[in-house]
Design a protein with these regions (language model features):
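C-terminal charged interaction modules
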Residues: 89-131
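Eukaryotic intrinsically disordered, low-complexity regions enriched in proline/serine/threonine/glycine
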Residues: 2-21, 42-47, 119-120
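A contiguous, well-structured "functional interface" segment within a domain
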Residues: 1-8, 66-70, 101
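A generic structural signal for short, non-catalytic loop/turn and secondary-structure boundary residues
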Residues: 7-8, 30, 52
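Acidic, aromatic-enriched beta-alpha/helix-loop junctions
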Residues: 35-84
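Alpha-helix capping and helix-coil boundary motifs
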Residues: 28, 77, 81, 94-95
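Amphipathic, interaction-prone secondary-structure segments
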Residues: 13-36
Length: 131
């Protein structure tokens, strides 16, 4: 696992894998404002599914929700978040949409953003006020 600590920023590459000509990268980032999970893909499957050669999605949640996310991912809170995310996405065919469904089912609020060649789409956390 690669990590970088820069002031109030910590970034962990929790999963990087290639399958054929496709690549998938999952990154966990801790900031003063909370936790971010980035999910990036590129390759033929991404192009076929989304009409873009690459796609990067990001889920943002408050640090106070970390224990709830670890429990939803791993079934207990003793695992670290990076390990729980790595284990979750190491399962065959697990996509970011599966994580969003899991968080919705567990009642864990989050904000979502996605960027690809077509532009950027954002969904703020329910109840958040856009500035």
């Amino acid at each position: 696992m690669g990590d970088t600590g820069i002031g109030l920023l910590e970034r962990y590459v929790v999963l990087r894998e290639r399958c054929g000509g496709d690549e998938r990268v999952v990154v966990l980032e801790r900031r003063a404002a909370g936790l971010l999970v980035y999910y990036g893909t590129r390759g033929e499957q991404t192009s076929e599914a989304f009409g873009s050669a690459w796609r990067v999605s990001c889920v943002r949640l408050g640090e106070e929700r970390e224990v709830g996310l670890v429990c939803a991912l791993h079934g207990e809170s003793s695992a670290g978040l990076a390990d729980a995310i790595r284990s979750y996405f190491s399962q065959s065919d697990t996509e970011l949409s599966d994580l969003l469904d899991l968080m919705d089912g567990a009642g864990i609020p989050y904000a979502y953003a996605c960027a690809d060649e077509g532009g950027i789409v954002c969904r703020e956390e329910a109840g958040a006020i856009a500035s």
